[in-house]
Amino acid sequence: MRIAILQNNSDDGPAYLGTWLTRHGVDFDVFNFDADDAPPATLASYAGLALLGGPMSVNDDLPSLRQSESLIREARDAGKPVIGHCLGGQLIASALGAKVSVADSPEIGWTKIKLSEGSEAHDWFGEFSGHERDALQWHYDAFSLPEGATLVAGNDVCPVQAFAVHNMLAMQFHIEIDRNKLAAWARNGKEELAALIGQPHVQQARSIAAEIPKRMAASHTLADRIYEQFIRLART
């Protein structure tokens, strides 16, 4: 069994997703569009598809984004699981006909998200469904719900934080982060964040980094449960 991972930016690699897959003996291939990798022509040899984040908008005129959407629809038609992190989640929404647009407010840094109750949420979140969890955000856009999708996570800043549909989970938040990835983001994003001082839902780099010790473990615990379901679906 192999998983295809689509990477949109060289600074936004698989991180904890790759660590988790390796730990559980799951093979995967990473297609880094930022390094001019071509996407897989088909998902025929893959059991599932994972999409990572990136600084671009789903609405940008980039061939890699349209190719990603095509692969998402192929996975849907084949009943294969798909998981999307931030831009990856927005690509799922767009591929399924939902609107992706600039959010009312950027959301950057550590936040709380409320995981829904119900069977779809429980499938992905298990015992965490119905509770608040820590999550790392870094997004300017937001998605609406595609037809037939179920809202499974939200908060006051971004009411649609995640949805489930067709063996797919689309998330605005970043469960794939690890310490190294987030520390690099905080370090490299200082100027970006400084330009957003005064925005009510944007943490500055120092605050993001300072909260890693107390927040990362909870993020990984949620990621563990989500990735377990992703691979469970890939094996069926």
Predicted regions and their residues:
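Short, glycine/charged-enriched secondary-structure capping and boundary segments
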Residues: 18-20, 46, 63-66, 97-100, ...
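N-terminal beta1-alpha1 cap of cysteine-dependent amidohydrolase-like domains
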Residues: 1-80, 197-236
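C-terminal helical/coil "lid" or tail adjacent to the Rossmann-like core of SAM-dependent
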Residues: 166, 175-212
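Catalytic nucleophile loop
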Residues: 74-99
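Pocket-forming structural segment of enzyme catalytic cores
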Residues: 96-181
